[in-house]
Amino acid sequence: MKFSQMPYQRPDLDAVLTGCKSLAARLAAAESEEELIHLYREENDFLAHYRTAQVLANIHYTLDTRDETWAAEQDWFDANGPAVANAETDIARAILSNPHAEALEKAFGSTVLPTLKNRVLSMDERVIDLQKEENALTSAYQRLYGGALVELDGKQLTIPQLTPYKQSLDPAMRRAAYEAEASYFDAHRAEFDDLYDRLVKNRTEQAHLLGYKDYSELSYVRMNRIGYGQKEVAAFRKEVEEQVVPLLRRMLDLRAKRTGIEHPMFWDSGVCFADGNPAPHGTYEELMAGARKMYHELSPVTGEFIDFMQDNEMFDVMSRPGKMTGGYEEIIPDYKAPFIFANWNGTSGDVDVLTHEAGHALEAYLAARTDIPQELQCPGMESAEIHSMSMEFLTAPWHHLFFGPDTDKYELYHAEDSFVFLPYGCMVDEFQHIVYQNPDLTPEQRNAEWLKLEQKYRPWNEFGDLPFYGRGAGWQRQLHIYECPFYYIDYCLATVIALQFFIAALHDHEDAWQRYLKLTRLAGTASYAELDRAAGMKVPFTPGSLTDLSREVETWIEQHQL
């Protein structure tokens, strides 16, 4: 069914809660392994109908945050979603109380019971009102950010539409683009500060009510991190600081020579080549045709997938006023249909959407066509991002369809950019640990902490007198910090595996692709480390785990300078 034809109906909250209560009682009383497994599947199917409505409402809302009809539906889910989450927690508690609970692990893999336990440990009716408020605050942030329009080059532009100007070969235009962005955040400084203040206090109160020392502890449970914790993530950040940051200093020196910019400032960071960054060649229709050709040639299953996506209107990728910034993929459960949302702006990032978000969508598409229960169809986000980030590299043999003579430039830019991202991702993560472990920090103190982390992870950045960024508030443009705290390190953990796929594909693309498919088809039935090992990849939590990888990527970058 085409997206435009998918009907939406607001769920009957009483019916959903009554159904959950009935299922919880039946699950607790199940008298055999077979009955418990059957009821677990029934519960997944029942809640999939609710999630379908929730996802449809959210997609329509983010497509135009100014639409009052869809804003009202989003508000309804913001207000009532926590009650449903609490009912799901009662279901998890009922399953875990059943003496046959271990049968689910035998049937569905190692993650099902830890996932249910984490749900019980991270939700309680005492925090329902706080979660309602949290949802309302994140939606307010989306409206504030998504509604941004700034003046530049005689035009009214959204924040995503500034990106090409940030990559302009004219240094004055680059600086002007950053200043235009900064002007919006500075004009709304009090609102951005207040929203984050209230979110930090809200989440901290939730953590305390649930018996946690601070929200960073609670977040690891809510993020369903299985098999590792804050200690391992801190060790990973240390590896990035020690192995990747020095490499990037050398790499950025090469980039400066390439661009001819003798003393790069922060607003020069988007320029990677003296004659301009690689940009996709072609119209929207031509890029979409290239995507169809690429995925048909990659494998039969990806050909089937891209036909489904394009034939059913499952892409909305053009930036426009009122549309939320950023990009995402969401599965619409009842239709087994992944939807891709993005904001194209004429840069290479447009092609990244056709690979990154399509990696997410392929996993969702495949999992929805198996007998894996719906709540196990997607793994933890550190694993889900492997699907997307690895796809960016595994589609390299077809990048010429989008970049033509600039393909070599794009390959170099993409490899460099993946490494540039790692320190930034670690910055975002460490910043959030600092904030939630010190929830009484003022806005000015939070900004000061961000600037300290700049020196630690990106010491090459010089802001001069650039507004907004110069005062340490640049983190406020990062959606995840407001909307889904502690998510961002997942991109880093996935990037390390994606870079291993990059190196593997250089040696044997077909073998790398088959290993990727093996990992992807496991969906959410295995943990991050189990998925990594299933694909023959190195888990990045031990000292020295990034040493060889960093060296191999650096060598490739040096050998492919243009």
What do the predicted segments below correspond to?
Residues 230-231, 254, 258, 298-301, ...:
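Inter-helical turn/loop segments and adjacent helix faces that build the functional surface
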Residues 196-207, 212-213, 251-255, 359-369, ...:
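Long, well-ordered alpha-helical segments
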Residues 275-334, 347-348:
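Auxiliary, metal-adjacent structural segments of Zn-dependent hydrolase domains
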Residues 115-117, 227, 318, 354, ...:
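C-terminal, non-catalytic "cap/extension" segments appended to globular domains
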Residues 242-243, 367-368, 378-406, 414-415, ...:
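Post-HExxH zinc-binding segment in Zn-dependent metallohydrolases
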Residues 342-368, 388-389, 393, 431, ...:
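Active-site recognition of the HExxH zinc-binding catalytic motif
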Residues 1-278, 290:
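A well-structured
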Residues 122-123, 181-188, 228-234, 270-280, ...:
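Glycine- and acidic
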